[in-house]
Structures are given as structure tokens and as C-alpha cells.
Amino acid sequence: MRTDINCDMGESFGSYRIGEDEKVMPCITSANVACGWHAGDPMIMARTLELAARHGVAVGAHPGYPDLLGYGRRNLETFPGEVRNYILYQIGALAAFAGAAGVKLQHVKPHGAMYNLAARDERTAKEVIEAVKAYDPGLILVTLAGSLCAQMAADAGLRVAAEVFPDRAYLTTGQLAPRSMPGAVIHDPEQVKERVLKLVRTGMMTSIDGRDLALRADTLCVHGDNPGACLLAASIREALETSGVRVVAMGAQ
């Protein structure tokens, strides 16, 4: 069995530092690099891609809404076509830096509110898919396991990586529990490790109300802006490899 560990990276901005990219990068196999709209800037993008190349980590674009103040976690009203073009713009920006760093983009993973809305809203999912296909139909689209977007992307012929968040609580619907809900983010590395092992052994994840959800996991996400992200990523990787699971980039699966 094989799986991927991904992390949102390059989410600092100017003098503001978010995450532990230098410590986390050696523990993961795919990096989702912010493209300057919800976080990141040209200097951060360049440094993050160079760091990923140094550690042999595959990279992808992590586009979000134009919302630095809200860190891309607020829903924004958009007109038809805007989400598609927001994503195209950001993929193009990151691709320029990727080319300069001598690396190729592997995937696209929308950020925050855009990601969550695409998981359940047909128009948003359609525009995400259109953007990826317009730029490069060979790119992998990372989206929530079991979501509307995952099914629509597969139907459209895209390569899909179904994503599971071991450090996030799930609703019984399969959606992520809102961050405003108590217990929505799990910080205990041991609890996260137990969830990962249950997932790889049974294909099930326990929801916030104790029910089991069947989830396909092509890639596991660790949130780089959480305290102790480095310890968490290392713990997950060790648990997987000890259980005989090969941890490789999603494009190598």
C-alpha cells in the first residue's frame, strides 16, 4: 500500500512568519505552495520551491481567494468564471517560479474556503476543474475524499487525489467540521496517529460524533500552520512506514 503526505507551505507573507516549513519539508512528500493571494509573496514562493527541490518533495499550486486579511478562510461572493480565472492566474504565477527552480508542478489543491465550497457546490467545483484542465490536464487535482468535486473531476477525466485530514474532525456527512466547532482541530499527535492507523487498516475515519466514515485516502494532509506540525508530520510518517505503508508523492502512485 502507498500513500502521500502533503502540507500547505509558503504561507508566510513579508515579515510575517507562518508555519515551520524548514522543519516540516523533510517529513512530507508533496507541498502545496501558496500563490500570493491568501498568503505567500514572490520571495516566499521562490524560497519554498527551492526548499522543496532540495528535499526532493513534489510541489503543487495552492490557490485561494484574494483574501490576505482572512487567510483565504472566508467565503467570498464571486461572479461566474471568477474562480476559474483566480486559479489560472495563481497556477501561472507559481509555475514561473517552479520553472526557475527546476521543478515541475505535480498538482493543484485549492485553499481554505475555496476548497470547502468546491467540495459541495457544483459551480465552484466546475470552475476549479475547468481551471486545471485549461492549464494542464495532466495535473492532479487534490480534493476532499468522497466529495462532489472529487466525483466531478473524475468524470471530467482529471487525475484525482482523494484527501483525508487526520488532524481535523469530520461531520457524519463527510465534510470537515467547521473550525469554530469545539474539537474541530486535533492537536494531540498520538490521537492523530491512531486515526491514521485506523484509516490505513480499515479505510474508516471516526466522525466527531463517533460514527465511522468510509474514506479513500490517496493523500494525507498535515496543516503546516498548526503548532507542532513538524512533530505531527514525523509521527504520521513513522506510523505509516512502521505499518508497511510506502510514503511517496501522489504522482508516483
From Swiss-Prot:
Catalyzes what? 5-oxo-L-proline + ATP + 2 H2O = L-glutamate + ADP + phosphate + H(+)
Description of how the protein assembles with itself and partners:
Forms a complex composed of PxpA, PxpB and PxpC.
**Which PANTHER family does the record match to this protein?**
5-OXOPROLINASE SUBUNIT A (PTHR30292:SF0), UNCHARACTERIZED PROTEIN YBGL-RELATED (PTHR30292)
The answer, when asked if Ligase is one of the entry's keywords, is no
Q: What does this protein do?
A: Catalyzes the cleavage of 5-oxoproline to form L-glutamate coupled to the hydrolysis of ATP to ADP and inorganic phosphate.
**Provenance organism:** Syntrophobacter fumaroxidans (strain DSM 10017 / MPOB)
Q: Would you tell me the protein name for this molecule?
A: 5-oxoprolinase subunit A
Disulfide linkages recorded for this protein, renumbered to the chain, are: none
Enzyme Commission no: 3.5.2.9
Could you tell me which Pfam families the record lists for this protein? LamB_YcsF (PF03746)
Give the family per the record. Answer: Belongs to the LamB/PxpA family.
Tell me the InterPro entries matching this sequence. Glyco_hydro/deAcase_b/a-brl (IPR011330), LamB/YcsF/PxpA-like (IPR005501)
Q: GO molecular function: any one?
A: 5-oxoprolinase (ATP-hydrolyzing) activity
Which keywords has UniProt assigned to this entry? ATP-binding, Hydrolase, Nucleotide-binding
Q: Which GO terms describe its biological process?
A: carbohydrate metabolic process
**Kind of enzyme, top EC level?**
hydrolase
